[in-house]
Amino acid sequence: MPRSSEAGYCCLSRDSNMPDSRDDQQQGASMGTSPDNSQTSSLIDGRTLSKESPSHGLELSAPEKARAASLDASEEALWTTRADGRVRLRLEPFCTQLPYTVHQMFYEALDKYGNLSALGFKRKDKWERISYYQYYLIARKVAKGFLKLGLERAHSVAILGFNSPEWFFSAVGTVFAGGIVTGIYTTSSPEACQYIAHDCRANVIVVDTQKQLEKILKIWKDLPHLKAVVIYQEPPPKKMANVYTMEELIELGQEVPEEALDAIIDTQQPNQCCVLVYTSGTTGNPKGVMLSQDNITWTARYGSQAGDIQPAEVQQEVVVSYLPLSHIAAQIYDLWTGIQWGAQVCFADPDALKGTLVNTLREVEPTSHMGVPRVWEKIMERIQEVAAQSGFIRRKMLLWAMSVTLEQNLTCPSNDLKPFTSRLADYLVLARVRQALGFAKCQKNFYGAAPMTAETQRFFLGLNIRLYAGYGLSESTGPHFMSSPYNYRLYSSGRVVPGCRVKLVNQDADGIGEICLWGRTIFMGYLNMEDKTHEAIDSEGWLHTGDMGRLDDDGFLYITGRLKELIITAGGENVPPVPIEEAVKMELPIISSAMLIGDQRKFLSMLLTLKCTLNPETSEPTDNLTEQAVEFCQRVGSKASTVSEIVGQKDEAVYQAIHEGIQRVNANAAARPYHIQKWAILERDFSISGGELGPTMKLKRLTVLEKYKDIIDSFYQEQKQ
């Protein structure tokens, strides 16, 4: 029996002549749609399918039946580099949960969450929502469209666009059709797109705008596997061969029988690849991280449980999707975990990181939220700017409330019975701040993908917002360690996800060693890169992360830096840069970015950038200092309000204050080889467009070393002479 019936889909408007078997069903006001969807442009026709409706054509199976995937992988290796390869799942003896596929996960979710709102999106300034039934049916339609376009097993559909329902439909549809989901960052150059699309053998590329379409048109001749491009947010500028809109894709898919799609779904196995995540490629070409269906479904279930994500039966989680879905952290959190637990995922505008994110947060009021450290830092800086512009009494009230709350959270972090002053501070001040940020209902705030400064963590603790860390890699399907309201320790990355394992190798006297991981989260291998796969996975199957850290007596992990980032001075001293960089930023609130230098050099030096405002249109750093930076200048006796005033004129007061701050950091250093002896302030803050930051705002150290080579070399010229 086919698992689907026809469900209307329309990106821009509904065709009134389109036949729809549900036209006789009067369910427009049921949960999951807005009552006026039929009058507004919509992704679907506006009616929610109920479980009892004969039109949905779904024969829901019991969980036991859905999980009964035949799997005989006893002879498989733990790794493969072939897109069509299989691996032996890491079931025994620590993680015996039955494996299942993405389709089985979604199909089970329909039984529990079918009528709940799944995806929220804005059309003509109004929020619209679709249910999990509609989500599933549209994904099937997209899957059939991909099959009609010629998607082959173990080939990819590459997606190049901002977060949207269509991104989700394309991803889920790809897996249903037996393909491999491959995200490409929207900031990627045509050359980077060409490398990834060629490496993953993309049969179809899905883009959102004409700008992204133009990139693909430039490189199409160099992509032998590419058969078609689908564009969804705006139509192509003209009719082009093998370029389709999303509506045309779905129309083509109607020619594929439901039974043909079901046959493909039924042959899928949990130990086959379904997602490719490409690393940033800071030391060469990007590596394609192959993730199996079991990697995805196991992590979506158990990784999120470790973060206290709730199933919709208890409380439907509401999340805002805005971080790049090409990154595993956003993809596993927004897309796959959402399906597992029946969350409602609402999409922010494409310019969310340029300043509109807070508007979406206020409108949606998420129950859990994830941001990379740079996002949390920008929120902190914005609050500080607003506070600086407030009246004397309001500013003092905020400082008092944050001081009282920070002290309470530091001294009695797990005490639910807070003293009267803390409750008063929260009621009078902090609750209003959280509401203004859109966090009034947010119970869990996560961060990952990069280290977070102690200053930022303490700032949000002062607002009664705990930031819960997760630690993992693309190669561990995202979270291998998680913090939660019940598993929290300040500055730590949480504890290992139950069912996973960790060990530290080559530990020093302080217990710091390389972090090695084992479990169902561990990737299949790097696509077409056997040597790199052997470097990452040892003979016993442990993933060597390249990250350094230590474990406390309770199993909480503390990251100390990257093995590859470890600075080895000319004198043979091993210096982890991150703690020193964080100490400088903590000591000097005017500093935005700090990067330590000294590998194979006789002493340490540092590049600094100043906190500046961002252009609201482009999100580029401007020359204007933030309010916090201006306050710092005033405190030290400077009238500067721009970066150029400080750097161009070598502002004596600011330079002296920075010198004194660095001397204080040096005074607290373990030994003289850890002292910063020279430093320079750059004329512009680090940014994605400048190349110093990656798509998730992670510092690209090799790029910085190359870009500012002349400045760095000048630090050491006297030494050479």
UniProtKB/Swiss-Prot annotation:
Keyword terms of this UniProt record: ATP-binding, Cell membrane, Cytoplasm, Cytoplasmic vesicle, Endoplasmic reticulum, Fatty acid metabolism, Ligase, Lipid metabolism, Membrane, Microsome, Nucleotide-binding, Phosphoprotein
Protein known as: Long-chain-fatty-acid--CoA ligase ACSBG1
Location of region: Disordered: 1-64
Enzyme class (EC, first level): ligase
Organism: Rattus norvegicus (Rat)
GO biological process, alphabetically ordered: long-chain fatty acid biosynthetic process; long-chain fatty acid metabolic process; ovarian follicle atresia; response to glucocorticoid; very long-chain fatty acid metabolic process
CDD domains in the cross-refs: ACSBG_like
Subcellular localization, as worded in the UniProt entry: Cytoplasm; Cytoplasmic vesicle; Microsome; Endoplasmic reticulum
Polar residues composition-biased segments: 26-43
